[in-house]
Amino acid sequence: DQKLDTATFYDKPYAYEVKKNKKREVKANILKMSLITKVVKAQGDTQSIVFDGKTPVVVINANEQEYDTKTGIMTATGTVTIKYKDLDTFSDKAKVRTDKNGDLKDIELIGNARIKQESNDSYADRFYYSAATKVLTATGNTTSKAIMDDGATLVLKANRQEYAQDRNIFNASGN
């Protein structure tokens, strides 16, 4: 009594999901869909795009991506790049969590992580951003370079840095 549990698609397949006004699509060399666990795995030259209406909001590229349709967790591994509005991120691994409507809950960048926004650049072992609190936390070997209003460059090195986006406040601790 054998049951088919995984569907595998080759030759650069494409899949998408629509929730309310948001569309999430994935392209890769190979797509695997578990019919039991409802997990989609993209392998080789993967790209995911989240649209709000017809506007691309987030573009994620990685060697491999896995999306659990039940939990709303997407895990990308291997040379991960994420483009979100005017923000570019780079890391070895990323986890993106969304709610049932497809809205961002949080994002985690793990390993050789970098965030670049305009002329500001931050590096850390790990970044964590909560959409609810609008707080970005960087931990492990953190370095931030920011260009001030007067043109001066600020370099901040610490073991932990925290940026409260809605209050525009930086906190740093540890050496």
Regions found by a protein language model. Give the residues of each.
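Mature-chain termini and adjacent capping regions
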Residues: 1-175
